[in-house]
């Protein structure tokens, strides 16, 4: 009968998942059914990234070669490998000279405690990266990635192709117990036997170590245009309407910056809506200072949240039409878009999915609390034609009775087995985006505005600045038994 190995891990500090400030510790219990020869027992913490990508044969080959199978691209990166020798004890090892000889242990249960070294911040595979290797890493922000797809075995089902392809990338962390037995005396079994016990663990670094660079800062030209030698805003004359924003040259062309508030970003709707005169247009804007980084439990629509609490409907065109036009919001929906990309040997595969965070129809009696034309104001007039103007009005979703209570990921949802967090690693990139949809009734015509905030950073932990002091862990009281003595 082979030895029975049991691995017991002490819970992490947050009692949910291990982080880079935890010292992974626990005990190993080995039950030997008979006397056995043991050379050493090691406990190690290991981490790996594995990605597999498929190449489209239509792209890589001609039509005549489609019948020939193509090899999948597969890549493995070693993130961490730290360990501790729990047997023989350290004082015995220091006294041994020469090669380590096996020890004879008697039958029964033997227990060994361990505490592994602190988890390093940077992945081990960096030293083995070749020059020109394609990765998703930021050069100045290289950290260990979090666990991803620990339940990948449950996704290998052809009845759901989305999950099947989603399982092609994984980041696994594990605690491994390895027992090296002594060499048997039989001539037909000349090699040592190694027994292993593996337990997967969930590892998520602190939010500061998951932060990656976002290209949402205004350029130097924009910053210089905000101020002159007198500290006043420069004025430019033009026959056309001057916008109150300067476009930021980033990867997201719909991101603007307010000239009056440089820290506020303006996220404009994807498309403009044509108004009944076929000349005037309308669009939606979300103005936020910190919409790009979202922690678990952050309010989304509540006033002062800095997310979707400052939304404006903007019209540009004929003043007479804007004065008499009534635009009615009928429905609001907020989605979280996930984009996961796997990279292997220069080939990338992408998986896209959507999560509905909120959906609510605005009842007729509540519409006046969300949008009123009396809240609107004219912000610009054309110098050549006073009838051409720009008008804006706040869409106060923060007054909506249900939306103002919404907090991001309050229930700690797991999407396809993974908590909600974004990250970049050597060969896996997980990015999220917000998608805000607003349905309109414009003089009987149904229209929809869409704002996409791409990308955003999502964190699994709560914002430390807003997090209240946690209560101590509950410790059950000792149990007592009553006995009567005569």
Swiss-Prot record:
Gene3D superfamilies hit by this protein: 2.60.40.640
Keyword vocabulary terms for this entry: Cytoplasm, Endocytosis
GO biological process annotation, one example: endocytosis
Pfam families registered for this protein in UniProt: Arrestin_N
Gene Ontology CC annotations of this record: cytoplasm
UniProt subcellular location: Cytoplasm
UniProt entry tagged with the keyword Nucleus: no
First-listed, main subcellular location of the protein, grouped into a coarse class: cytoplasm
Similarity comment text for this entry: Belongs to the ART10 family.
Reported function: May regulate endocytosis by recruiting RSP5 ubiquitin ligase activity to specific plasma membrane proteins in response to extracellular stimuli.
This protein's name: Arrestin-related trafficking adapter 10
Organism: Zygosaccharomyces rouxii (strain ATCC 2623 / CBS 732 / NBRC 1130 / NCYC 568 / NRRL Y-229)
